């Protein structure tokens, strides 16, 4: 393969599951035993900000556990970026930092990041590694405003969609890794890439909801599938 091949990779919870990151269980609508509308919607935050902050504080702490680390799939993507540079774009639905820890740099967190918070009024974003408490305020506003997790909740617009759609229109390969295919707009990316002529590939533990839109599908563990498939580009 030449260095000029352009690849967009979409990653979902499946790539981080083997690293020990707990995932949202869509089948029963629970996220770590919390109803989604309580902890992952703007309305839930308005009703009970303490509960929401506590929920994300616990998820943030999880990232610093000795048991959480990038796996072979994350490292394979980072290695491919060394060769392709800006011709590889990773778009992740995950809010963890495992891609960064593996070495990936050309990366879009379309659903936000656990290690960032933002002001509810100005939208100013801050790096944040500890807990968010009720006394933590954004000092950029007068009067001071509360901080919220820099997470895209249900009902909110994903981040950097214009950049993502441009990349989908220009890529030669679209590779989806560890995604369910039931969360939009990400589930529609494969059809966009197909429309513009990309070769589409699904690497998943099991078939996704949009498997029929892929030119090529391979099923198994991400830690095995991803390094093996990406080797052809190295």
Curated annotation (Swiss-Prot):
What is its cofactor?
Zn(2+)
Give the EC number(s) under which this enzyme is classified. 2.3.1.286
Binding site residues for substrate: 56, 59
Where mainly found?
cytoplasm
Domains (record comment): 2 residues (Tyr-56 and Arg-59) present in a large hydrophobic pocket are probably involved in substrate specificity. They are important for desuccinylation activity, but dispensable for deacetylation activity.
- Give the matching HAMAP family: Sirtuin_ClassIII
Name of protein = NAD-dependent protein deacylase
Q: Which NCBIfam families match?
A: PRK00481.1-5 (NF001755)
- Subcellular location(s) of the protein: Cytoplasm
Q: Which residues form the active site?
A: 111 (proton acceptor)
The record's family statement is:
Belongs to the sirtuin family. Class III subfamily.
- Biological classification of the source: Bacteria, Pseudomonadati, Pseudomonadota, Gammaproteobacteria, Pasteurellales
Q: Give the matching InterPro entries.
A: DHS-like_NAD/FAD-binding_dom (IPR029035), NAD-dep_sirtuin_deacylases (IPR050134), Sirtuin (IPR003000), Sirtuin_cat_small_dom_sf (IPR026591), Sirtuin_class_III (IPR027546), Ssirtuin_cat_dom (IPR026590)
Q: Which UniProt keywords apply?
A: Cytoplasm, Metal-binding, NAD, Transferase, Zinc
Query: Reaction(s) catalyzed by this protein?
Result: N(6)-acetyl-L-lysyl-[protein] + NAD(+) + H2O = 2''-O-acetyl-ADP-D-ribose + nicotinamide + L-lysyl-[protein]; N(6)-succinyl-L-lysyl-[protein] + NAD(+) + H2O = 2''-O-succinyl-ADP-D-ribose + nicotinamide + L-lysyl-[protein]
Which residues belong to any copy of the Deacetylase sirtuin-type domain? 1-234
Q: Which GO terms describe its molecular function?
A: histone deacetylase activity, NAD-dependent; NAD+ binding; protein-malonyllysine demalonylase activity; protein-succinyllysine desuccinylase activity; zinc ion binding
* A GO cellular component annotation in the UniProt record: cytoplasm
Function per UniProt:
NAD-dependent lysine deacetylase and desuccinylase that specifically removes acetyl and succinyl groups on target proteins. Modulates the activities of several proteins which are inactive in their acylated form.
Encoding gene, per UniProt annotation = cobB
- Primary enzyme class: transferase
| Disulfide partners | none
Note the Pfam families from the entry: SIR2
PROSITE patterns given for it?
SIRTUIN (PS50305)
Residues at which NAD(+) binds? 12-31, 93-96, 178-180, 204-206, 222
Cofactor binding, per record: Binds 1 zinc ion per subunit.
Q: Binding residues for Zn(2+), per the UniProt record?
A: 119, 138
């Amino acid at each position: 393969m030449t260095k000029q091949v352009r690849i967009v990779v979409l990653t979902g919870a499946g790539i981080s599951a083997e690293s020990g990151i707990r995932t949202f269980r869509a089948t029963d609508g629970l996220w770590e035993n919390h109803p989604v509308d309580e902890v992952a919607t703007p309305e839930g935050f308005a009703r009970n900000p303490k509960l929401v902050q506590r929920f994300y504080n616990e998820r943030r702490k999880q990232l610093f556990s000795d048991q959480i680390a990038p796996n072979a799939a994350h490292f394979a993507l980072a290695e491919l970026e060394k060769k392709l540079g800006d011709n590889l774009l990773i778009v992740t639905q995950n809010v963890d930092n495992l891609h960064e820890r593996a070495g990936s740099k050309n990366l879009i967190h379309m659903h936000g990041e656990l290690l960032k918070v933002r002001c509810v009024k100005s939208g100013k974003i801050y790096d944040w590694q500890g807990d968010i408490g009720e006394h933590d305020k954004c000092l950029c506003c007068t009067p001071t405003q509360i901080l919220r997790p820099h997470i895209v909740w249900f009902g909110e617009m994903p981040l950097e969609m214009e950049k993502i759609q441009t990349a989908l229109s220009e890529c030669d390969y679209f590779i989806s890794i560890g995604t369910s295919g039931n969360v939009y707009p990400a589930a529609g990316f494969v059809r966009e890439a197909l429309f513009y002529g990309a070769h589409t590939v699904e690497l998943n533990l099991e078939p996704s909801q949009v498997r029929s839109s892929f030119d090529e599908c391979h099923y198994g563990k991400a830690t095995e599938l991803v390094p093996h498939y990406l080797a052809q580009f190295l």
